[in-house]
Structures are given as C-alpha cells and as structure tokens.
Amino acid sequence: MNNTAEITVLGAGSYGTALAISLASNGHKTLLWGHDPNSMQVLADSRSNERFLAGIRFPDCLAIEADLGKALAASKNILVVVPSHVFGDVLKQAKPLLRKDSRIVWATKGLEPETGRLLQDVAREQLGDGYPLAVLSGPTFAKELAAGMPTAISVAGTCPSFTHELVELLHSPKRLRVYANDDFTGIQLGGAVKNVIAIGAGMSDGIGFGANARTALITRGLVELTRLGVALGANAETFIGMAGLGDLVLTCTDNQSRNRRFGMALGKGCDVITAQEEIGQVVEGYRNTKEVYTLAKRLGVEMPITEQIYQVLYQGKAPVDAAKELLSRDKKSETSKKS
C-alpha cells in the first residue's frame, strides 16, 4: 500500500484491529496505528494480531504504522479506538499532526475519568470546533466482527454528510449493517452505562441468583440509562436501539464480555484487584462506574443499580449486600420517573 488510505484507525487493541479488518475486508485501504513500535512490527510481520485476535489474518489492503504523524497524514478519516482514560491524551498528541480536512470518529466507549464528561466534550476541548465529529457504537464483540460474523452498529455525528459517508464506508452486505442516528449524545452514553450494568449482571450470576435476577437488572438498567440520557438531552428512543438495548443485552448476557466476567468474579467472592487480574485486559466498566456515578450525582439523576455497583467497586460493599439493598428499596410504580 502507498502512503494514502481511505481511513486510519488509531488503536491496535482487539476492537480497533477488528474494525480495521472489517474495513479492509470491504476493499477499503485501511491503516492501523498503535503506539508501541515493537508490537506494530510484530503485527506487520505476522499479518495478524495474535494477542487479541488469534488466527485471523489481515486483508491485503490493511497496512500497519507506528508513526502517528504518518498515520494521520495518510487519510482525512480518523477512527479512534482507544480506552476512554487515554482518549483525551491521544487527541492531544494528534492535534498538531492532523490534516486540515480531517474528520474524527471514535468507537471508544466510556466517559472522561473523574469528571464524567461525554467524549464529545473532551474532543472539542482538545481539537476545537474545526473538525466534524462522529461516534459509532453498538453490540459488537471484536472477535466476531473480525471473523466476519453478522453485526449491526449505529453511527451519529455533528455533520450529516460525514455520518452518511461513514455509513457507506463501514457498511458491508456480508458482515456489518450500519444504521445512521441523529442522537450524537445518546449514542455515546449507551456505551458507558452498559458496562456498568454488565458488571451488575455478572455479580448477580456470580452470586447464583439466576436468570430472573439478571433480566430484572438488564431491564431496570435500561431505565437508568434512558433516564440519564434524557437528562442530558438525548432521545429516549435511542436507548431501545443498537447503542442502548442492543449493547446492553450483549454485554450483560455473554461471557465474551470482560465487564460481565469481572462482575461474576466479584459475585463469587473475589476482591476488585483479584477480579481485574483474572480478566487480564482492561475492564472499562470499572472506570465507567465511577464516571457514570459522578455524572448522575451532578445531574441529580437517580440510578440505584449504578450506585450499588459503585459502592461495591469503590467502597468495599459485598455484592450480596448490594443486592439486598436493591430488593428492599421502597416500592415504586414501574413507570415512575424515579426507580
């Protein structure tokens, strides 16, 4: 491949690599950047990412790059797929290297650590208002996407024409269906809150509560997500779509989810540190819980499930005690604006 690409993907973890593979499998010239030169050389030599996606070969039109400047110069379309806690730092590094015609889309799920700000606010702070922004989200396990299994996601952005171009670029009749959405805020929020609820669902299963309890957590978790989203100006309908209910069900019910497995370990009696070590990869929901809790408190939004998970992760409460407290709360109408 020469030094041009239709899209550059920043982040060579499991999800970034999977999206790069999907794009390249569509015949799009795709460039994948990672911050560690040695690791990227291994990817280039092996034509695979054996650490995260063992056995899946890179398409011919997927190139590897460890130089951020070269990666950003190669394409105007930049897809950021890094953990939420380094999202701002990566954009800060990228800013002086971006092309004037760059457009930024991210698949990072989460909020800004400590502040609970949406990533759109972080992006604008780091980049200013001169670049079109977009986000993609939905129920996706990286290995299934990379393997070409059918998947569906949603895309929303600040510029309708950019959103439309992303739908065309990402969509594949064989592997990936992409829906346009005009709710930029709502699409971002779902990816953070679902990680929190997935930890709760995992804890419930780890304790041994069964399918009834898991389903109740998912359902009431969706209520909490919707309530928080509406408080931020999002459209309630967004949360019954791919980036809301879709991502929530996937993450809460399948053991490919690191957040669910982390919660299961806690429910079985592991402490937080041991549970994280068992997973062996970033558990985004751990940070997301604090971020969502902080945001909800700031907005005055009642999120009882999120609050109990926060107390387990950050205040040492036993998962079984958190469950008891949720069950013993005052009786409410199911359709009440407060749970």
Swiss-Prot record:
Pfam families, alphabetized: NAD_Gly3P_dh_C, NAD_Gly3P_dh_N
Localization of this protein: Cytoplasm
Family according to the record: Belongs to the NAD-dependent glycerol-3-phosphate dehydrogenase family.
Superkingdom, natural source: Bacteria
Active site positions: K194
Keyword Membrane annotated: no
Entry binding sites for NADPH: S14, Y15, H35, K109, A142, R258, V282, E284
Name of this protein: Glycerol-3-phosphate dehydrogenase [NAD(P)+]
Molecular-function GO terms, alphabetical: glycerol-3-phosphate dehydrogenase [NAD(P)+] activity; NAD binding
Transmembrane regions listed in the UniProt entry: none
One Gene Ontology cellular component: cytosol
Record's keyword terms, sorted: Cytoplasm, Lipid biosynthesis, Lipid metabolism, NAD, NADP, Nucleotide-binding, Oxidoreductase, Phospholipid biosynthesis, Phospholipid metabolism
EC number: 1.1.1.94
HAMAP family reported in the protein's UniProt record: NAD_Glyc3P_dehydrog (MF_00394)
Originating organism: Shewanella denitrificans (strain OS217 / ATCC BAA-1090 / DSM 15013)
Pathway linked to the protein: Membrane lipid metabolism; glycerophospholipid metabolism
InterPro entries documented for this protein: 6-PGluconate_DH-like_C_sf, 6PGD_dom2, G3P_DH_NAD-dep, G3P_DH_NAD-dep_C, G3P_DH_NAD-dep_N, NAD(P)-bd_dom_sf
Gene (UniProt): gpsA
Keyword Oxidoreductase listed: yes
Function: Catalyzes the reduction of the glycolytic intermediate dihydroxyacetone phosphate (DHAP) to sn-glycerol 3-phosphate (G3P), the key precursor for phospholipid synthesis.
Residues reported to bind sn-glycerol 3-phosphate: K109, G138, T140, K194, D247, S257, R258, N259
Catalytic activity: sn-glycerol 3-phosphate + NAD(+) = dihydroxyacetone phosphate + NADH + H(+); sn-glycerol 3-phosphate + NADP(+) = dihydroxyacetone phosphate + NADPH + H(+)
UniProt GO BP: carbohydrate metabolic process; glycerol-3-phosphate biosynthetic process; glycerol-3-phosphate catabolic process; glycerophospholipid biosynthetic process
